[in-house]
Design a protein with these regions (language model features):
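Short, basic (Lys/Arg/His-rich) helix/loop patches that form interaction surfaces
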Residues: 21-30, 103, 117-159
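Short, charged phosphate-coordinating catalytic segments
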Residues: 42-65, 155
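Conserved tyrosine-mediated DNA breakage-rejoining catalytic core shared by Y-recombinases
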Residues: 54-89
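Short, polar N-cap/turn motifs at the start of nucleic acid-interacting alpha helices
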Residues: 59-64, 152-171
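Basic, Lys/Arg- and aromatic-enriched nucleic-acid-binding interface segment
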Residues: 7, 11-45
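DNA breakage-rejoining catalytic core of tyrosine-based enzymes
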Residues: 1-19, 77-86
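Active-site/catalytic core of tyrosine-dependent DNA strand-transfer enzymes
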Residues: 14-15, 85-130
Length: 171
């Protein structure tokens, strides 16, 4: 997808895509709860798709204030530990339980290209307004939501993303 402009999902686009992935559309789009769950996690945690797909049950740790993920970012090699909302933790744990996923196993045993391919099929079916949506749009959606809910605080988003500068975050 190099060279292609990716935009953040709007709230409406996010809801429509996730609903379509969970429910499917007749014979055109088969339901795919796994991909829907992957994108929900990306949009609610702000991870890159590769980092989302590398999550294991053992990535979760109990902290005095709740739960956190321990990951090493694929792109940067940076070690990250960050708090996860209880609702997100429970959502992901319920998914892992329903799929019979053990501690050391990947929660989402699927490749990045497979997720991108299925998302593109859904976006192509949804039509105009969805052509610039990719898996990265869900990470951007997370940042956009944080930005507006916190008084347009770009520095907060930069810190959450662990970007080197606000200019990188704003791009």
């Amino acid at each position: 997808m190099a060279g292609k402009t990716t935009t953040a999902c709007t709230h409406e686009q996010y809801e429509t895509i996730i609903k379509t992935l969970y429910e499917g559309i007749g014979d055109c789009i088969q339901p795919n709860p796994r991909i829907a769950t992957i994108l929900v996690i990306e949009a609610n945690v702000g991870l890159r798709i590769g980092d989302t797909l590398s999550l294991r049950r053992s990535s979760f740790i109990k902290t005095p204030s709740g739960h956190a993920f321990n990951i090493i970012e694929h792109k940067t090699g940076k070690v990250r530990r960050f708090k996860v909302q209880e609702q997100v933790y429970n959502f992901l744990l319920e998914y892992a339980d329903s799929e019979g996923i053990e501690d050391d196993n990947l929660i989402f045993p699927i490749g990045v290209r497979a997720v991108q391919k299925h998302l593109k099929k859904v976006c192509d079916w949804l039509g105009p307004g969805y052509e610039d949506i990719s898996t990265h749009s869900f990470r951007k959606y997370f940042g956009t939501e944080i930005y507006y809910k916190n008084g347009k605080d770009i520095e907060l988003v930069r810190r959450l993303y662990q970007h080197s500068s606000a200019a990188v975050t704003a791009s």
